[in-house]
UniProtKB/Swiss-Prot annotation:
Alphabetical UniProt keywords: Amino-acid biosynthesis, Aminotransferase, Cytoplasm, Proline biosynthesis, Pyridoxal phosphate, Transferase
Annotated family: Belongs to the class-III pyridoxal-phosphate-dependent aminotransferase family. OAT subfamily.
The protein's name in its UniProt record: Ornithine aminotransferase 1
Needed cofactors: pyridoxal 5'-phosphate
Cellular-component GO terms for this entry: cytoplasm
Organism of provenance: Staphylococcus aureus (strain MRSA252)
Catalytic class of the enzyme: transferase
Catalytic function, reaction form: a 2-oxocarboxylate + L-ornithine = L-glutamate 5-semialdehyde + an L-alpha-amino acid
Pfam families: Aminotran_3
Single Gene Ontology MF annotation: identical protein binding
Length: 394
């Protein structure tokens, strides 16, 4: 294990500080390291593996398509793209979809769409369009996505970033109201903040944002890359407040844990600002990606993983709420997406949980984030709870 870590560290760029653990195999909700030790995966690649590791249905779809046709680029039609587009548009109740690859790429595309809509439809002077984001957000680390962040540590050394962005406190509707100007084209938010620490907004907040957008002719963009596709016990986390955004951004679990697939979805009145040449993606919507993503969506539906997430997530949250320890500040969550916020450094607790076979990670120093594959079973949930009880008892 040490030699693998040393080799990787020697050649890798220094933009990650991974746990000193080498994973070699994954199946369902479990992974194994090079020593053969088994872990319940409560990271899931940050919600990439919602369908579980190496799901046989998705693997089968991948291998069959890979042996037939992998890529032709979007200068031609493929025989599976339209069917996938129909499936995902019906799921999101949107007219159009832009297929892409990584999550941050989809955020970049959404920014472009919002800006062009702002100038072409709302009539804002080109170059004056504004987008409002939330403090403690995480939309990615490419230049446009980074411009939406309020974290100076992420942005330092990368200026100048995009102009025309503002951030306000997540959950503060008065602050958001004050930030809106005639040049505001879009408000972008994660319905539940993931990297920010599983932050759930006050009840009614998302509805109030929707009302503001309607009042001021502003696009509401929901970044559901991490929280969508069943993670919170709903197909989309926006459903917790019965709010429909103007733009959905999806990713991570859209590729079934096997391939990078993302998407931007909107209705005709928004998506029509894109015309040939205004945007493109060489790998976006390639036949292999589409075969995998189609299977990934089918698995979520056919195995009722969204409902499973809500049911088992509720069970896990109730069990964790029984934990009593002076270090625990708050435990919160929706579905199988749970944050345990401490009033001290979470890293030592994470280390002890990993020793007990629970693979997890801290975020923002004091928060333990849990996001196991949605295929996890009740026995594995009980093992997670037992490990937490043991760690906090000792």
């Amino acid at each position: 294990m040490n030699s693998i870590i040393e080799l990787t560290d020697y050649y890798s760029s220094n933009n990650y500080a991974p746990l000193k653990l080498v994973i070699t195999e994954g199946k369902g909700g479990k992974v194994w390291d090079t020593d053969g030790k088994q872990y319940i995966d409560c990271i899931s690649g940050f919600s990439v593996a919602n369908q579980g590791h190496c799901h046989p249905t998705i693997v089968k779809a991948m291998t069959e398509q890979a042996s037939k046709l992998s890529i032709i680029s979007r200068v031609l039609y493929s025989d599976n793209l339209g069917k996938w587009e129909e499936k995902i548009c019906h799921l999101a109740k949107k007219d159009k979809v832009l297929p892409l690859n990584s999550g941050t790429e989809a955020v970049e595309a959404a920014i472009k769409i919002a800006r062009k809509w702002g100038s072409d439809v709302k009539g804002i002077t080109d170059g004056q369009v504004e987008i409002i984001a939330m403090n403690n957000n995480f939309h990615g680390r490419t230049l446009g996505s980074l411009s939406l962040s309020n974290h100076d540590a992420y942005k330092s050394g990368f200026h100048p970033l995009l102009q025309g962005t503002k951030t306000v406190d997540f959950g503060d509707i008065e602050q958001l109201t004050q930030a809106i100007s005639p040049n505001t084209a879009a408000i972008i938010l994660e319905p539940i903040q993931g990297e920010g620490g599983v932050n759930i907004p006050p009840k009614g907040y998302i509805q109030a944002v929707r009302q503001l957008c309607d009042k001021h002719q502003i696009l509401l963009i929901a970044d559901e890359i991490q929280v969508g596709l069943g993670r919170t016990g709903k197909w989309f986390a926006m459903e917790w407040e019965q709010v429909v955004p103007d733009i959905y951004i999806l990713g991570k679990a859209l590729g079934g844990g096997l391939y990078p697939v993302s998407a931007v979805l909107a209705n005709n009145d928004v998506m029509r600002v894109l015309t040939p040449g205004t945007h493109g993606s060489t790998f976006g919507g390639n036949p292999l990606a589409i075969a995998i993503s189609t299977a990934a969506l089918d698995v979520l539906k056919d195995e009722q993983l969204v409902e499973r997430s809500e049911r088992l997530g509720s069970f896990l949250l109730k069990a964790l709420l029984q934990l009593k320890h002076p270090s625990i500040k708050e435990i919160r969550g929706r579905g199988l997406f749970i944050g345990i916020e401490l009033n001290t450094d979470a890293a030592p607790f994470v280390e002890q949980l990993i020793k007990r076979g629970i693979l997890c990670k801290d975020t923002h120093r004091t928060i333990i984030r849990l996001s196991p594959p949605l295929v996890i079973d009740k026995e594995e949930i009980n093992q997670i709870v037992a490990a937490f009880q043991d760690v906090f008892k000792n």
